[in-house]
Curated annotation (Swiss-Prot):
CC terms in the record's Gene Ontology section: cytosol; PET complex
Protein function: Probable ATP-binding RNA helicase required during spermatogenesis to repress transposable elements and preventing their mobilization, which is essential for the germline integrity. Acts via the piRNA metabolic process, which mediates the repression of transposable elements during meiosis by forming complexes composed of piRNAs and Piwi proteins and governs the methylation and subsequent repression of transposons. Involved in the secondary piRNAs metabolic process.
EC number of this enzyme: 3.6.4.13
Full protein name: Putative ATP-dependent RNA helicase TDRD12
Tissue expression profile of the protein: Restricted to the gonads.
Domain Tudor: residue ranges: 56-118, 809-909
Superkingdom, natural source: Eukaryota
Binding site for ATP: S453, H454, C455, G456, N457, D458, P459, L460
GO biological process: cell differentiation; fertilization; male meiotic nuclear division; piRNA processing; spermatogenesis; transposable element silencing by piRNA-mediated DNA methylation
Species of origin: Mus musculus
Length: 1215
């Protein structure tokens, strides 16, 4: 017996090893090192010598070649020669390293005799007395049996490879030598148990034994081999051979082929019969010491299904020391032989279910109803069924218990999929979940890992074992000593990243400091460029877009990275496919450098769904990954099971099934039919008792009208499976979705549809996605309803997110809330009126004292738990401000009926045309905090573009500051521009378009029919224009009208204080012209003018060096604009086009400079376009505030200045 090191495996009949330890076959390792050094010195010095190159090349020739991979000269055998245009290419086998490599003819040298004295270092081995078998299926006879084969099955080879890979020590006992091949009994030590590999292959039906005597049982094609110990072989046998007494007596080869391994008999016997037979032949005490072997039987694409990991398996793969060896001449009858064969079959009755679980145990588990959920594995994994046996550090095991006992709702939600409800109630941790028991061990060993499960969004599937690896600092010592993370966790959104970051903070108390960093980088280049990681940061939690932006400026970020974790991998590839593969390419490039060979490199992907991108991830970026799938419908996608669906009526289901089976080939094959009831089962059995299924795995689904509730889910599954979907299913599903949408008529409008104009998945969203005229009528604040258009003043009190606020509309004339508030304060001044509510009802209206104010509140929820003083917590909503608050019961005051009459004054406001960047659907808290600090409690001016129910859509929303000394006002900021300036939001031009569609579908007035189409009150723009003109020209102009005047203006009427005249937009005689309203903004080299008229006919535009004349007809109205420009333009490069049904003029500047205004003379119909304000502020991460002291010419906050009132407003006339 000697120890060996396996170099290369082709199959159990051909593998190369290095002999270790003391043996008369072994040369000293130092001799090979000296040989290697001498060969390199010699051939490097003689590399240009023509005499050293062989004159001709032949297959089987011994030579010396240069190996690019090993960077040295090696002894080799030429296996084949291929000719090409400029040289010959030889496939060579390196005899000392057991490698096949292609070598150019110029790198082949003659083998010097002195270098060929030492034997080849790689020895060729094969298993002694062991031959391959295969499963032969006779479709005509409808049976299957295991028969001898001429070559090893791929499943046997892969099992053999996995078995040796899992060993800690491999030993061999030499039995024979045939030419250059050593025939051995191979022993592998697995978990301190020694297993005879020869026996194990036979016991698992991967091989059969042949007689060691002469040539009697040899295949006629095989050559006889020389026995090293022919005398002892006749009397001493391997302990495993005691189970095969008749086969070792030289029985006829063909008889063994037909009867020795009768597969059908062994499978048709019941477990009880098999148990009785094996008890008659051999007592079970001989197998009590058997241990579970590392079993792996791959089926399609390497899938193995393990039905019950809880049942300890019994295997015949270990040695049986208590059994006595049998002589070759000893004769047994046929019953004893069959009993021994069936004993092996009982120990592992079905090689297609190679988990070692007996049918008897399976039946017992089914009867008890405790069958564990299935799991599909790519490699054999030993699950950790308890926390004590899990591969976690002791501190983390304690932390798992502590986290579970936490009362925080977030932790309970995170554990929801992992811990059974009864365990949560008992506050006891039962151990890792079913999925975690398979995912933790490979991750803790540093293996590449893919986990697909229904609970695949749970970070606890990978976080504890990952933290365990990060505690072992020794494996990272070879990495460069610079700042950079060891692990990066990529999440599909900032919200999940925030949760994992907080979870890391909790777990870091039980580990060495990892200094995790939450990385969310916006669109601004400077933010990524100036980002600096703190020293000692070992873990980064981020999103794909943020990480890629950082990599753009920090190319060495992955220099120390060893662990890349992809959380919710299916969502990552769905929402950021290009970014993910860019990150993976960068990671692969960094970990494959030679300096990183000794450091770990691991990719862990955890998700809910399998898709083609994950398949590409496994093939291109992972090395021998472990794949765990506990969602069996996802395993079908992984296994490429063909999905077919047929739609039919319930009454036609049986006939449709028979039609499907008619397309089955004439030779009967296996079909498994699932039915909904016993009656259907009997009908199907009578209708087609002998029909069988397709040879290729196929799933055929019959969908009837009774399965309408499953139609949407089935369609989504078939889409992910890339199946051929009949058009009828799309129509059927559309009808189902429409019916579901009708049922949601009383549900609130989808918040995402309101905020952004779209919902990510209407099929699963519980809210409504259409306008209900009954529910969405603008509600009344008093005797007036909410405004559906026009300009308003608002004060936001509660900031839900960056674009969603709750507040009040301020009416300058009659503020009913102020009156109510004054009356409530006066009432509650009397201490006798402050009566606490004894009985609290849900949705009841009460009073609440806050500092010096009294608020009306509505009870939303009353807590069932009471504190020590008997005061339970109550969740209330302040109906006049929109915010919610948690208070105690004694804070509620009885509210008189007279204070109930005024409807709630809180209104919901949504800022339009902006949405989160990076395909997010939730605003980053950084933006929400900034906007909250900016706008809460302040008066703002806004334009209403839509009103539904209690919600107003506003665009724009600005903060205005009055300059009383100058009798004018300026705009401090535009809320939408502020959001965009943070770099966390992008333009959402489709927002209003989607709202228009909703309006049309609900048959409500179209947007164009709404009376108000003006922008911010002209007086506000005029005051800003005046400020810009004063800044640019240094002159003094008259102030525009006050802001109060603008509140009174009606749609289509713009009031000016110049001469106190009011100019109407009523239709005028044909002989007169109208001046169109114009919005403008500028870039470095051009100025853009938007003419705010639609349905234009016969438009003309003439360009001069300092002037533009535009004219057009709209219906029976003639519009004319003669604009004298502030600066010069290149008239040949200017153009006028129709875009979005409106004229758009582009003026090319003569010089690339910033204009402080558009016109030399002020025109009230020409205003700066504040919607493009942010485009002038790209260079700054924050928007510039317009004020009276510092007005930038670049931002030009800047409508136009005017010296006279000769020009008129939109619709005004000129002679």
């Amino acid at each position: 017996m000697f120890e060996v090191l396996v170099l290369k495996i082709e199959d159990p009949g051909c593998f190369w090893v290095i002999i270790k330890g003391c043996s008369h076959f072994l040369e000293q390792e130092v001799d090979y090192q000296k040989l290697n050094t001498a060969m390199n010195d010699f051939y490097n010095s003689m590399c240009q010598d023509v005499e050293m190159k062989p004159l001709m090349l032949e297959e089987g020739q011994v030579c010396v070649v240069y190996c690019q991979e090993l960077k040295c000269w090696c002894r080799a055998l030429i296996k084949s020669i291929i000719s090409s245009a400029d040289h010959y290419l030889a496939e060579c086998f390196l005899v000392d390293f057991a490698k096949y490599i292609p070598v150019k003819s110029k790198n082949i040298r003659v083998a010097v005799e002195s270098f060929m004295q030492l034997p080849y270092r790689a020895k060729k081995f094969r298993l002694y007395g062991t031959k391959p078998v295969t499963l032969h299926i006779d479709f005509c006879e409808d049976n299957a049996e295991i028969v001898p084969a001429t070559k090893w099955d791929s499943a046997a080879i892969q099992y053999f490879q996995n078995l040796l890979r899992a060993t800690t020590q491999v030993e061999a006992k030499l039995c024979a030598v045939e030419e250059d091949t050593f025939e051995v009994y191979l022993y592998a030590t697995i978990k301190n148990e020694k297993v005879c590999v020869n026996d194990d292959l036979v016991a698992k039906n991967f091989a059969y034994y042949v007689s060691p005597m002469g040539n009697k049982n040899l295949n006629p094609l095989e050559k006889p081999r020389q026995s090293l110990n022919s005398v002892t072989c006749s009397s001493k046998l391997s302990p495993s051979l005691t189970l095969w007494p008749m086969l070792l007596q030289g029985k006829d080869y063909h008889r063994m082929e037909n009867k020795a391994l009768n597969y059908k008999d062994s499978l048709t016997d019941s477990p009880k019969m098999m148990l009785e037979k094996q008890q008659q032949s051999l007592p079970l005490k001989h197998t009590e010491k058997c241990t579970e072997s590392s079993v792996y039987w791959p089926t399609k694409r390497g899938i193995t299904i393990y039905a019950d990991p809880d049942v300890p398996s019994v295997s015949g793969s270990s040695q049986r020391p208590n059994e006595k060896p049998l002589r070759l001449t000893e004769k047994k009858d046929c019953d004893e032989k069959n009993g021994c064969v069936k004993l092996l079959q009982f120990l592992n009755p079905d090689p297609l279910r190679a988990d070692g679980t007996s049918d008897l145990h399976q039946l017992q588990k089914v009867k008890l109803g405790t069958l564990q959920p299935g799991v599909v594995l790519r490699n054999r994994i030993e699950p950790c069924l308890t926390l004590e046996k899990s591969p976690l550090s002791a501190d983390l095991k304690k932390m798992a218990l502590t986290c579970l006992n936490s009362d925080t709702e977030d932790m309970k939600v995170a554990m929801e999929e992992m811990i059974p409800p009864e365990a949560l109630q008992r506050n006891k941790f039962p151990g890792p979940s079913h999925t975690a028991s398979y995912s933790w061990p490979p991750i803790a060993r540093g293996c590449d890992m893919v986990v697909i499960s229904h609970c695949g969004n749970d970070p606890l599937l990978y976080l504890p074992p990952l933290l365990t690896i990060l505690q072992m600092g020794g494996c990272y010592k070879s990495l460069p000593s610079r700042n950079g993370p060891l692990a990066v966790i990529v999440c599909p959104g900032w919200k999940k990243a925030q949760f994992i970051f907080e979870l890391l903070g909790d777990y870091s108390m039980s580990s060495r400091p990892l200094h995790p960093v939450l990385l969310t980088i916006g669109l601004h280049k400077d933010e990524a460029k100036n980002m600096k990681l703190p020293r000692g940061c070992d873990v980064i939690v981020t999103t794909p877009h943020s990480l890629l932006r950082l990599l753009t400026y920090r190319s060495l970020l992955f220099l120390r990275l060893c662990h890349l974790v992809l959380d919710e991998v299916h969502m990552l590839f769905f929402e950021a496919n290009e970014q993910m593969f860019a990150i993976l390419d960068n990671f692969k490039k960094n970990v494959e450098v030679e300096e990183r060979e000794s450091a770990p490199h691991q990719i862990v992907a955890v998700g809910v769904h399998w898709n083609k991108h994950i398949d590409h991830l496994v093939r291109e970026f992972m090395k021998d990954p472990c794949v765990v799938i506990t969602a069996l419908e996802e395993a079908a996608l992984y296994g490429s099971v063909q999905q077919v669906v047929h739609l039919c009526l319930e009454c036609e289901k049986t006939s449709t099934l028979l039609q499907v089976l008619d397309f089955v080939p004439s030779q009967a094959q296996k079909t498994l039919i699932f039915t909904c009831s016993v009656a259907e089962t009997e009908t199907v059995c009578k209708g087609s008792p002998a029909e069988q299924g397709d040879k290729k795995t196929k799933s055929v689904l019959l969908l009837t009208e009774r399965n309408a509730s499953h139609a949407v889910g089935i369609l989504r599954y078939l889409e992910r499976a890339d199946a051929k979907i009949p058009s009828e299913l799309y129509e059927f599903t559309a009808g189902v979705l429409e019916a579901k949408e009708d049922k949601k008529a009383r549900r609130p409008l989808c918040p995402y549809l309101k905020a952004f104009g779209f919902c990510k998945d209407k099929r699963i969203c519980p809210d409504r996605h259409h306008i209900n005229p009954e529910m969405d009528i603008p509600r009344k604040l008093s005797n007036k309803t909410l405004p559906v258009f026009g300009h308003i003043r608002v004060i936001p009190f509660y900031i839900s997110n960056a674009t969603n606020y709750f507040g009040r509309i301020i009416d300058k004339h009659v503020d009913l809330y102020e009156t109510l508030n004054a009356e409530m304060n006066e009432y509650f001044k009397e201490s006798s009126n402050k009566t606490s509510a004894e009985k609290v009802e849900n949705l009841g209206l009460y009073g609440l004292e806050e500092k010096t104010l009294f608020q009306r509140v509505q009870v939303l929820e009353v807590s069932q738990k009471e504190d020590t003083w008997g005061l339970g917590s109550i969740l209330v909503k302040l109906i006049d401000e929109g915010r919610t608050k948690l208070i105690t019961r004694d804070q509620l005051l009885l509210l008189p009926e007279k204070f109930h009459t005024l409807p709630p004054q809180a209104v919901e406001f949504i800022v339009c045309r902006v949405k989160p960047a990076d395909s997010e659907i939730e605003w980053n808290p950084k933006v929400t905090r900034y906007i909250h600090h900016k706008i809460v409690g302040k008066m703002h001016d806004a334009k209403v573009v839509l009103a539904l129910g209690n919600t107003l859509w506003i665009d724009p929303m600005v903060h205005v500051t009055k300059l009383s000394n100058l009798k004018t006002s300026i705009i401090d900021y535009n809320v939408r521009a502020e959001i965009l300036s943070m770099g966390m939001g992008i333009d959402n031009s489709e927002h209003l378009e989607q709202l228009k569609k909703l309006y049309k579908e609900a048959k409500l007035p179209a947007f164009e029919d709404l009376p108000c189409q003006t922008s911010i009150p002209t007086t506000v723009e005029d005051t800003v224009c005046l400020q810009g003109t004063q800044q640019g020209d240094g002159g003094t102009e008259r102030g525009a009208g006050s802001q109060e005047d603008s509140d009174n203006q009606k749609p289509g009427v713009l009031s000016e204080d110049i001469g106190s005249e009011t100019i109407s937009s009523a239709p005028q005689p044909h002989g007169r012209s109208f001046h169109p309203q114009i919005k403008w903004f500028q870039k470095d080299d051009v100025v853009i003018l938007k003419i705010k008229i639609r349905n234009v006919k016969d438009y003309k535009c003439k360009f001069f060096t300092d002037r533009v004349i535009f004219s057009a007809w709209v219906g029976d109205k003639f519009y004319l604009a003669d604009l004298e420009l502030q600066g010069d333009i290149r008239k040949d490069d200017c153009k006028c086009i129709i875009k979005d049904d409106e004229p758009l003029i582009t003026l090319a500047k003569e010089k690339q400079e910033c204009w402080c205004g558009l016109l030399k003379q002020r025109n009230p119909n020409v205003a700066f376009d504040f919607d493009h304000w942010e485009e002038c502020e790209e260079d700054s991460p924050f928007s510039k505030v317009v004020n009276s002291k510092n007005l930038s010419c670049k931002v030009a906050a800047l409508a136009e200045s005017s010296g006279s009132s000769s020009d008129t407003t939109d619709g005004s006339e000129s002679e």
